[in-house]
Amino acid sequence: MHVSAYTNWAGAYSTKGDLLVVSSLSPNNKGLYGLETVFHEGMHQWDLQVFEALRQQAIKLNKFFPRGLSHGLVFFTAGEAIRRVVPGHVPQADMIGVWQRGLRQFKVPLEEIWKPYLDGRGTRHEAFAELIKRTAVEPPTKE
């Protein structure tokens, strides 16, 4: 992990080589949000595996994997991890309006399906299957 004054517009990023870069000057990384950001970016190291597991569930239903779901999982999981340690913590996704900017359709399914998995109920496979059932989109019709 590298800490730098400037990273990018988001204040942090990760690459496919186990590199995490976090801005020390971004207001979104102050206090507990810095820890949440590190956790968030660290989770991106498994993007390919998570994407493939979700995609396989979508294939079983003959549907398309919904764009944005895997990033919603990352935001939600990182926020939940911090909230469990510090009750009352407002997750970064809520603080910066992530759910209002393109990931709105995932918040309720994540709360109803993914959070119970994080609480120890069910398996990841079952949670992914339910998330895809709730959020996947129909393939385009061939004309």
Stretches found by the model and what they are:
Residues 1-14:
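Auxiliary, metal-adjacent structural segments of Zn-dependent hydrolase domains
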Residues 15-22, 46-60:
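Flexible internal linker/loop segments at domain or repeat junctions
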Residues 11, 15-18, 71:
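Mature, well-folded catalytic/scaffold domains that follow N-terminal targeting or propeptide regions
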